[in-house]
């Protein structure tokens, strides 16, 4: 509904891509194996719903607007290995559908990408960055800190 509203609001608006960063909590559900089919159905419905805006879509068609599906932290893969392979594996090898998987779990050197664990997300006061180290239950994203990436870790992408 938001995408449609944005396209309706201004005919100069163009949908370039969809950035999809979801799936973590699907892994902890008993129904995790249904997620790949549900994702495909959602993708098809989204594209159908926006077909009236083809002229405002990258490539001239809602059917070819790229979906960029981002990875999650290593916590989820370590905790829910089978489920991770089912949910996140469904985003992989779908280039023919214009669905692209972006691995974020490790950096360019193969090291685990830092999470919101205080030891992995220190404050860098000289840079004006206050990470998980200075956060408490009043201002953190989740009490399960390794489930989210450090904000500093993903800069520059």
Explain the meaning of each model-derived region.
Residues 1-157:
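Cell-envelope and extracellular/periplasmic
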């Amino acid at each position: 509904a938001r995408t449609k509203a944005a396209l309706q609001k201004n005919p100069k608006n163009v949908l370039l891509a969809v950035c999809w960063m979801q799936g973590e909590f699907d892994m902890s559900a008993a129904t995790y194996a249904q997620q790949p089919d549900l994702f495909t159905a959602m993708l098809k419905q989204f594209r159908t719903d926006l077909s009236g805006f083809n002229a405002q879509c990258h490539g001239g068609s809602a059917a070819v607007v790229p979906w960029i599906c981002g990875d999650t932290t290593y916590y989820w893969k370590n905790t829910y290995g089978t489920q991770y392979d089912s949910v996140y594996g469904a985003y992989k090898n779908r280039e023919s559908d214009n669905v692209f998987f972006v691995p974020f779990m490790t950096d360019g050197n193969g090291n685990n990408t830092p999470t919101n664990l205080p030891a992995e997300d220190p404050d860098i006061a000289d840079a004006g960055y206050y990470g998980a180290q200075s956060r408490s239950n009043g201002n953190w994203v989740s009490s399960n800190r390794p489930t989210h990436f450090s904000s500093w870790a993903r800069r520059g992408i």
